[in-house]
């Protein structure tokens, strides 16, 4: 009888141990984190490593980072449940929300402001001063699903009666903000679309990617868009709610910590996060309409 009781107690202990492990959000899980390639994908992966380490340590989970070759790659990975959490640009989020079972939880801030801008840039010596001056010129968009590198600039052009296909001499899709800035600086194109964190030329893409202050002075903004709700963090609805809440807590804490702020700025030139909701991005949905871009068609064209 004593041996039987020992076996029973042993089995009960194993059962309780298994239940405790299965109840833990950390048990046997790999968290798959997606990053949009706002710049060179390898550079994004490198900049993401400190964050990956923090998530690994704080969650006690293995972290699997994924940087797509373009914005569509992250949207598609969310659609087929290959990611648990992802950093998305506003336009990518609007597309992903239509395709995937996701929820936006946080949006980024820059200098305490949860907005940023599309900026149309040229060389300071180009003679181009207005959008009308772009007719007959060469122009670089970023990724075709980029918020500031394509969607909002297209809306700006349409509002001014400019059809890039008809009115520009040549259109280039650079694939990233860094490439667009360099294309303009080096004279590969006459002008291009990128981002600025403020419309006062104090925190811009060309300041980030051009290390020589003299090169920065060679770039001038022609126009800025309306304020755009900032890029965000989304989670899969299938993710354990406890892990999801822990992620939110981690990013909010990073937003309050000077070292955390630097890490986020190195990654996507942001300073922190605040809570977000889907309705925050209604203006981006309107921008697609204003640009004459259908959501479904935008994603299908990119896939093909």
What are the language-model segments listed below?
Residues 28-50, 235, 239-304:
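An extracytoplasmic/periplasmic, membrane-proximal ligand-sensing/linker region
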Residues 17-20:
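C-terminal motif of bacterial Sec signal peptides marking the signal peptidase cleavage site
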């Amino acid at each position: 009888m004593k041996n039987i009781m020992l076996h029973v107690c042993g089995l009960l202990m194993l059962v309780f141990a298994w239940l405790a492990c299965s109840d833990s959000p950390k048990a046997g899980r790999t968290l798959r984190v997606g990053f949009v390639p706002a710049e060179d994908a390898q550079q994004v992966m490198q900049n993401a490593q400190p964050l990956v380490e923090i998530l690994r340590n704080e969650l006690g989970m293995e972290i699997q980072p994924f940087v797509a070759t373009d914005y569509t790659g992250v949207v598609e990975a969310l659609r087929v449940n290959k990611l648990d959490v992802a950093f998305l640009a506003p336009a990518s989020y609007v597309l992903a929300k239509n395709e995937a079972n996701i929820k936006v939880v946080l949006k980024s801030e820059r200098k305490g402001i949860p907005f940023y801008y599309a900026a149309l840039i040229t060389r300071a010596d180009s003679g181009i001063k207005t959008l009308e001056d772009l007719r007959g010129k060469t122009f670089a968009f970023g990724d075709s699903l980029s918020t500031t590198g394509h969607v909002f600039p297209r809306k700006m052009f349409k509002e001014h009666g400019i059809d890039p296909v008809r009115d520009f001499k040549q259109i280039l899709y650079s694939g990233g903000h860094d490439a667009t800035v360099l294309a303009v600086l080096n004279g590969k194109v006459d002008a291009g679309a990128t981002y600025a964190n403020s419309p006062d030329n104090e925190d811009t893409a060309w300041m980030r990617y051009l290390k020589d202050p003299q090169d920065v002075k060679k770039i001038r903004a022609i126009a800025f868009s309306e304020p755009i709700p900032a890029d965000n963090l989304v989670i899969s609805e299938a993710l354990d709610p406890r892990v999801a809440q822990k992620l939110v807590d981690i990013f909010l804490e990073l937003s309050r910590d000077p070292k955390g702020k630097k890490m986020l700025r190195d990654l996507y030139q942001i300073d922190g996060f605040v809570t977000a909701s889907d309705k925050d991005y209604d203006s981006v949905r309107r921008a697609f309409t204003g640009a004459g871009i259908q959501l479904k068609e935008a994603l299908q064209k990119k896939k093909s």
